[in-house]
Amino acid sequence: MNLIPTVIETTNRGERAYDIYSRLLKDRIIMLGSQIDDNVANSIVSQLLFLQAQDAEKDIYLYINSPGGSVTAGFAIYDTIQHIKPDVQTICIGMAASMGSFLLAAGAKGKRFALPNAEVMIHQPLGGAQGQATEIEIAANHILKTRAKLNQILAERTGQSIEKIEQDTDRDNFLSAEEAKDYGLVDQVMVPES
């Protein structure tokens, strides 16, 4: 069963059927609506690069409803957002958790949004290790370095002190849209259009 809707567009040249994501891409909208893994990251990065090649001046809109996922895959998206010329507006719909919240904060300053009932969750990276003691030590050191890097970037993106970020990400920390705004993860809570 195909759960991806199809949109039929009629022009003077005839009809064309698009899957909904391809149609949204024409309007510079990218949807991140799943766990972040390498395949999702490659898809998002490809779309960002494609939209930059089409028009390096127009904003790109990244809608996020994600429980998070792989840190390295998330960094691929984050670095691309920072690298490309167009501003990337980030919009939280539903939930932006873990790496999803990190990408929400990655949007262009002043252009990071959350819908009124959206939730944001920040925490420290998760990981596991097994094997010999030295292998466990290597893995532990790596995750500590990763945590420090994530905390440093979150501090820069939110305006919070590194100490506050470390304290607030020690455990799962759930924020409402308004709380995410006060924290600096988003710049504005979107109100319904009238």
From Swiss-Prot:
One of its GO terms (molecular function) is ATPase binding. Its EC number is 3.4.21.92. Pfam families: CLP_protease. Its main location: cytoplasm. Keywords: Cytoplasm, Hydrolase, Protease, Serine protease. Gene3D superfamilies: 2-enoyl-CoA Hydratase, Chain A, domain 1. It is found in: Cytoplasm. GO terms for biological process: protein quality control for misfolded or incompletely synthesized proteins. It catalyses: Hydrolysis of proteins to small peptides in the presence of ATP and magnesium. alpha-casein is the usual test substrate. In the absence of ATP, only oligopeptides shorter than five residues are hydrolyzed (such as succinyl-Leu-Tyr-|-NHMec, and Leu-Tyr-Leu-|-Tyr-Trp, in which cleavage of the -Tyr-|-Leu- and -Tyr-|-Trp bonds also occurs). The keyword Protease applies. One of its GO terms (cellular component) is endopeptidase Clp complex. It is an enzyme of class 3 (hydrolase). The active site is at residues 98, 123. Fourteen ClpP subunits assemble into 2 heptameric rings which stack back to back to give a disk-like structure with a central cavity, resembling the structure of eukaryotic proteasomes. Cleaves peptides in various proteins in a process that requires ATP hydrolysis. Has a chymotrypsin-like activity. Plays a major role in the degradation of misfolded proteins. Belongs to the peptidase S14 family. PANTHER family: ATP-DEPENDENT CLP PROTEASE PROTEOLYTIC SUBUNIT. This is ATP-dependent Clp protease proteolytic subunit. The lineage of its organism: Bacteria, Bacillati, Bacillota, Bacilli, Bacillales. The gene is clpP.
